[in-house]
Amino acid sequence: LDIQNAGGGIQSTTNATRQASEQELAAKASKALDEMMGFGTTTVEAKSGYGLATEHELKALEVIKDLNDHHRMDLVATFMGAHLVPAEYKSNREEYVRLVCEEMMPKVKEQGIAKFCDVFCEADTFTVEESRQVLEAGLKYGLRPKIHADEIEAIGGSQLAGELGAISAEHLIVCPPAGIEAMAKGGVIACLLPATSFNLGAVFAPARDMVNAGVPVAMATDFNPGSCPCLNMQFV
């Protein structure tokens, strides 16, 4: 979070994504998909979330759609305009949440370029109430909810996932017992990302507690430019 607040991390990747053309993004992604396929992966969930502006979020989702059409890998797209409040909206968070819900989502729905909606519910990103607003708007536009929750601080993201019946909650490194209980009741899949914990030197999510509580557990790479360079599910 310190790196992010200093303009690095997600914001740095956002700046690079905005400057890149669709062709440049597709070439970079295609190379990563080739490597994933070499490790035996045949289906990938790909998220937007590094555009953080309508034009660039749609650009990323269009690239995912084109790759699904032309690459051997099967891709499933997730809209994640609520990954971070971008620098230009730091003093007007409410307007950015409105932009995500009232401008981006209708266009995503109209173009049919995403199946899921995700939000990063965490300290210094989106509050529980902001996350609720985003995910409920996603449901309105036919986007099934997912949530990044309890990665650094347990602020209530896993409980929100259970309340909304999200398809999955990601990270969950510091997921509390109340969050596990809520996910079990809501039928939420805990999508754990241990390669990120490994890369950051962080603790691992309480997977055994989740299994014992009846929460279905899945794992993924969390391949991204900032916190996890891993493309290999065999390592995960």
Q: At which residue positions do the language-model features occur?
A:
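His/Asp/Glu-enriched, well-ordered alpha-helical/loop segment
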Residues: 138-145, 162-164, 192-195, 201-236
